[in-house]
Amino acid sequence: MQENTRLRIAIQKSGRLSKESMKLLSECGVKMHIHEQSLIAFSTNLPIDILRVRDDDIPGLIFDGVVDLGIIGENVLEENELKRQSLGENPNYKLLKKLDFGFCRLSLALPQENKFQNLKDFEGLRIATSYPQLLKRFMKENGINYKNCMLTGSIEVAPRANLADAICDLVSSGATLQANNLKEIKVIYESRACLIQKENALIKEKQALVDKIMLRVAGVMQARESKYIMLHAPKEKLDKIQALLPGVERPTILPLAHDEKNVALHMVSKENLFWETMEALKEEGASSILVLPIEKMLK
């Protein structure tokens, strides 16, 4: 049977990575119409199908070669990889790129009233988690015996409901822990979204499309962390002013009409400019300072 030449990309249907995944694809020029209840969306300008599934299903779809690409949190990817390995399987995939969203951490937490001295305080405790494999690996590496309490949601209420003594759950800001009278003790895994590809080689048409998408993803991410700077600067202060601006490439220096002492400086800065930097530029004699966002960028 001839392989379908349309590229299949799996993303989270709903949840913390869903909107950012769709935004990334859109910024990469993938046009599509999404219906809320639909599990699949077809790109209208590229041979791409978007599968909207549960995040826990994405690693398996990649491991089994059902889809070509997937956007998934590293925590879910690693948990599923460890689970497959525990069953004697050897899951394979290609990590194409770590993305700039979905940042979180998997942490051990205890009730606020519990005194904590070191990790051995978790010895023999019952720990509620949705990530048993990551927890098991960490505890084994640290020589700690514990009892596992597998839950799929509302992990933070487990101690209060007397289901567990402690929890191991995802933390972003820590507000949920605080609201449930818990304190974060130890980060056991740091995670972000990533773009992965199935291990088996793609046909020529699909690989060419993946290469195009990867170029665009890199451009989008670089644009997000860069700013276009325009300012007027005294000629004698150019070196000091340029030193304050970490640029992707050398700046463009342009003469100003009827002004022999100053020039216009245009450049792409690889870092976000804070007020302190702009104030430092001002102190060095820069004026008319403009900091503009960059929508797309290719080096």
UniProtKB/Swiss-Prot annotation:
PROSITE patterns: ATP_P_PHORIBOSYLTR (PS01316)
Compartment annotation: Cytoplasm
Names of required cofactors: Mg(2+)
Keyword Cell inner membrane: no
Role: Catalyzes the condensation of ATP and 5-phosphoribose 1-diphosphate to form N'-(5'-phosphoribosyl)-ATP (PR-ATP). Has a crucial role in the pathway because the rate of histidine biosynthesis seems to be controlled primarily by regulation of HisG enzymatic activity.
GO molecular function term, any single one: ATP phosphoribosyltransferase activity
GO cellular component, one term: cytoplasm
Family named by the database record: Belongs to the ATP phosphoribosyltransferase family. Long subfamily.
Pathway: Amino-acid biosynthesis; L-histidine biosynthesis; L-histidine from 5-phospho-alpha-D-ribose 1-diphosphate: step 1/9
Family annotation (PANTHER family): ATP PHOSPHORIBOSYLTRANSFERASE, ATP PHOSPHORIBOSYLTRANSFERASE ATP-PRTASE
Keyword Iron: no
One GO BP: L-histidine biosynthetic process
Organism: Campylobacter jejuni subsp. doylei (strain ATCC BAA-1458 / RM4099 / 269.97)
Reactions the enzyme catalyzes: 1-(5-phospho-beta-D-ribosyl)-ATP + diphosphate = 5-phospho-alpha-D-ribose 1-diphosphate + ATP
Entry EC no(s): 2.4.2.17
Name of the protein described by the UniProt record: ATP phosphoribosyltransferase
Regulation of activity: Feedback inhibited by histidine.
Keyword terms of this UniProt record: Amino-acid biosynthesis, ATP-binding, Cytoplasm, Glycosyltransferase, Histidine biosynthesis, Magnesium, Metal-binding, Nucleotide-binding, Transferase
Main subcellular location: cytoplasm
